[in-house]
Structures are given as structure tokens and as C-alpha cells.
Amino acid sequence: MTLRTLVIAGFCAFVGLVWIIESGAADVFLEAARPDFQKIPLAIAGIENLGGTESPEGRVKLGSRIEEVLKTDVRRSLVFALVDVNGLGIKAGQLGAEPDPSFKHAVENGVSVVVWGRAGIKSGNKDSDVNMDGYVYDAGNNEVVGGKRYVGSTSVVRLMAHRFADELVFRYTGEPGIARTKIAYVSELGSARELFIMDYDGYDPRQLTADGFLNLMPRWSPDRRFLVFTTYRNRNTQDIDLLELATGKRWTLVSQGGLNITPALSPDGNFLAYSSSSEGNAELYRMDTHSKAVQRLTTNAGGDLSPSWAPSGRELAFTSDRSGGPQVFLISADGSNVRRLTFEGDYNAAPAWSPRGNWIAYVCRTPRKEYKLCLITPDGQKRVQLTTGPGVDDSPSWSPDGRHIVFSSTADGKSHIYMINTDGKDLERITFTGTHNSAPTWSPAS
């Protein structure tokens, strides 16, 4: 069955298609993923606990919890190489706000950065204030180059650690870290599909919609304030809505009749690309988000959908079956210069353009008829398969630093959200609740 047939077949067939075609892949492309990239050796001396626990039951020491989150964030940054502090002779409880003589031994053992801190709770209830002081020693300068106090309630302890990690990344790369980013996704609730949001590491999942409809294919606005998504209010109408995260307010952006699907906002937020069958065939359209003027971008006998913007905003990748089976194509933002990108394999769909611009992830069907994630350069000269193993891998979305991809997979039976580095390493499952979690989309950096 062709992609066009599936799209035109209607509601039931299309819902089945959504879980298959919204996919992608990944590979090495950024400084931290290059074979010659040297991670910065970093030792976390510890977060000294000055009193209090993260939970009112007293089970988790505050300092230990912050240290655990910080270590995970630093590891996932792919900027630093964590060095075991055992044997280095440095302990957070013995450190002040100045370089310590014990750092000399650490530096002799290859450490470039030492991080430590202190944390305590002012009073005994769970809503009391937490003070966390974080320090950074840089061996190159032989000085403490960072010292900062973080203050908040016990409910934001993880956020404090995330912020500290992001500031470390920014200090040493000049780029925002990803520890405070969010991932929106779709979760099955009975016969409905509702939108959820969670921290990038899977913590603190929160439901965004609760209307009992099918709410699918969310995508972020560049300012992180909104999500655009397709909503199925009935069997014959699929609209594109805008959801304001801070207030929960919703607006309908596209209601042209027929299928209105796979929305994607441009990097500057000025345009919305989407697919619509309002004129009979699934074609790509572009809406000016200010004037609401709509321009049709494609006209052909095949079905066109799943647009993904290049970071420049000048091009889009999309899926089309105009050549037979689903393949990835490129098109200029004004509808000109359409060309086919993928030629290997009979099924390539759901492209996701990396924020660095030099890779496009997509779903590829292997010779063994497995749906996996692949990467291809925009010039088509290099292609790699990222994922292997059991299950259907689907719905890729890039981290804002371009070092990771989040996607859904049925590797464990049910569909859940996973994260993987762009070199294919460190595969991690990050959702553990819900019966079916899919269509993840990674927020821009804060």
C-alpha cells in the first residue's frame, strides 16, 4: 500500500500510519561526537550535605541527590569525561571557595575541572528553602572560576542541579546545555491520545490535554511557549491547534477540512508548515503565523507530509510517495527546487533536520523489513543506520545541542520513549509509565 493510499484511506488507516511514519535517525556530526573530540576531564568532589533531606521521610540526603542528578547531567552533556574522585584525595567537606592544595594531585592525574558544592535546608518542612552553593575549579587558570548560590524550595532541587550542569556546559562550550530542556510526547489514555510533557531525563511527567480526543504529532515553538499539534475532534476533521503551555489556552490554527497533519513551526516562528488534504490530495502548505496567509508548496499526484525545517529556515525536508514508496525529499521554503534525498531502501520517512544542519534523521526500513533510525547528510553523500535490535523505532527528534536523539520504540513490547547519542551509544529508556508513549519532540534550550 502506498503512502498516498494510506493518507486518503481516512481516519482509521491514518491513525495507524502515524505510529509508523513519524520516525527518524542519527549519527556523529558535532564537535562532541567527532572521533577526535577530547572530552574535558571533570571530577565531582561531591555536594556536602549541610542538613536536611530532599524528602520529608528523611530517606534521601539532599546533597547526595543533587550530586546524583549533576553526575547524570554532566555525563549526558558529552562535553565532559567524569573522573572517579576515589584516590584523588579531594572531598567537598574539606573545600572552601579557593583552590585547595589537594587539587594538585587531581591535576597530576589528568583532571582539568573540579566541581563541588554545599546544600542545606533552612527549615524542616518540605516547602522550605534550599540553599545550594556550587563551585568550579579550572586547572588551566589554577583558580575557582565559578561560585554561585542557588535558592529554591525542595520541589526544585533537581532543577538546581540541572541549572548548575547547564552553566558548566555554557562555560566550557559557549552553548546552552540541555539539562533544563523538556520533551513533549503523546500518551495513550484509553481510546484517547493526550499530550504530556516531562523533563529531558524523563522525570516529572505532566499531562497537558484532557479532552478525550486524539491529540498527535506535537512540535515546539522556538520560544518554548507553545506546542502545535494535530487534533482529531471527529472522524472527518483533523485540525491543527496551538497550545500555550503556561495557561493551557488553545487556538485552532488550521481547519481547512480533510486531514491537516504533521505541523512544524519555522525556526523564527514566522511560518507553519503542514500537510493538508483539503484540496483532495495530501500536499504541503505554509502559513504565515502573523497574517494567516496560506501558500501551497507542492502539487503532485503523490502524498506529501511530515515537513521538517532546516535550521536556516530556507529549506524543508519532507516525506513523499511521488516516486512510488515513501522517500525523503527536500524543498525550498517557497516551494521551489524539489529534489529527492533518499534512494537506499524502499521506505524512508518522517525526516527530522538536526539543529546543526548537517544531518537529517529519518525512519528507514531495513532489508529485513525492520523500522529503524537512519541519518543522511543533506547532500545525500553519507548515510548511516543508527539503531538496531528488536521493535519499531519511530518519531525521532533532536536535542537542541545536536548530540542526542529522542524517539519512540517498541523494543520492550509497548511503545516508550528512548534517548540515544548521535554516535549510537548510551541508549536509555526514559518513560516507564503509561501504556503507549510516542511522538516525542525535544524543546529548544532555555
What are these regions, as identified by a protein language model?
Residues 9-19:
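Bacterial N-terminal signal peptides
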Residues 18, 27-28, 96-167:
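Amphipathic beta-strand/beta-sheet edge segments enriched in Tyr/Trp
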Residues 140, 199-203, 244-248, 288-292, ...:
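Short loop/turn segments that connect beta-strands within beta-propeller blades
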Residues 183, 224-227, 269-272, 313-317, ...:
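Hydrophobic beta-strand positions that form the internal "hydrophobic ladder"
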Residues 176, 187-194, 211-213, 230-240, ...:
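A flexible loop/linker signature enriched in serine peptidases of the S9 family
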Residues 31-102, 115-121:
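Short beta-strand->alpha-helix linker/helix-N-cap micro-motif
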Residues 157-192:
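Pro/Ala/Gly-rich low-complexity, hydrophilic intrinsically disordered segments
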